[in-house]
């Protein structure tokens, strides 16, 4: 378990972990990914809180600073998936053509627009959450990684030619998925001003990420690393935006 956790940290962050280089990303590290999400979420909440002290409550600068730190700590891994997936979904042609576009090193207009939208929405939502419930930032980041476990549940195929997809797609058994969803719902209860707001936010977020992944399976023939990254970022964004909106009620 510790080796899987170390691999998950090495894969999803810039943190070097002993022995992780010899363990490829697979079932165990994917199961442990929400633990990494919780750590990243705690870091994000701390940065947002510090930013609010410097720039003032609800300042967009504190939210954008938080997003910037997350991008650095994760090496921009997931946001790159947002760009590639958006470009793949935006192109015409069969799955092979879409996958080729995703593997291309350049970023098209769909990818640029998607990245800008995700960063802006996350930054503004994080800024709002610094005043209405900073724990919601941790919850949002965690929800993205739990969504990744859901996307890798049994019966979900990998797209043809995807190295990461072939290692993690279909690896997560139903009890593992259910356990992480239960944990997410449990910790979401105190994350908002009212106990019902957090659960609603994460349910909407996880559903959005799962729906995106399902569409990508239909469009590409399976999931890829880019699809996982885009599902993570979408769920994080939707969770933060939904909770920020509900907390204003």
Curated annotation (Swiss-Prot):
Topology of this chain in the membrane: Multi-pass membrane protein
One Pfam family, short name: CobS
Pathway(s) served: Cofactor biosynthesis; adenosylcobalamin biosynthesis; adenosylcobalamin from cob(II)yrinate a,c-diamide: step 7/7
Organism superkingdom: Bacteria
Catalysis performed (reactions): alpha-ribazole + adenosylcob(III)inamide-GDP = adenosylcob(III)alamin + GMP + H(+); alpha-ribazole 5'-phosphate + adenosylcob(III)inamide-GDP = adenosylcob(III)alamin 5'-phosphate + GMP + H(+)
Cofactor section: Mg(2+)
UniProt keyword list: Cell membrane, Cobalamin biosynthesis, Magnesium, Membrane, Transferase, Transmembrane, Transmembrane helix
Protein name: Adenosylcobinamide-GDP ribazoletransferase
Cellular component terms per the entry's GO annotation: plasma membrane
Organism of this sequence: Mycobacterium bovis (strain ATCC BAA-935 / AF2122/97)
Stated role: Joins adenosylcobinamide-GDP and alpha-ribazole to generate adenosylcobalamin (Ado-cobalamin). Also synthesizes adenosylcobalamin 5'-phosphate from adenosylcobinamide-GDP and alpha-ribazole 5'-phosphate.
TM segment ranges: 32-52, 109-129, 132-152, 173-193, 198-218
A molecular-function term among this protein's GO annotations: adenosylcobinamide-GDP ribazoletransferase activity
Signal peptide feature range: none
Record has Membrane as a keyword: yes
InterPro entries from the UniProt entry: CobS
EC number from the UniProt entry: 2.7.8.26
Residues forming coiled coils: none
Record-stated family: Belongs to the CobS family.
Subcellular locations according to the entry: Cell membrane
GO biological process, alphabetically ordered: cobalamin biosynthetic process
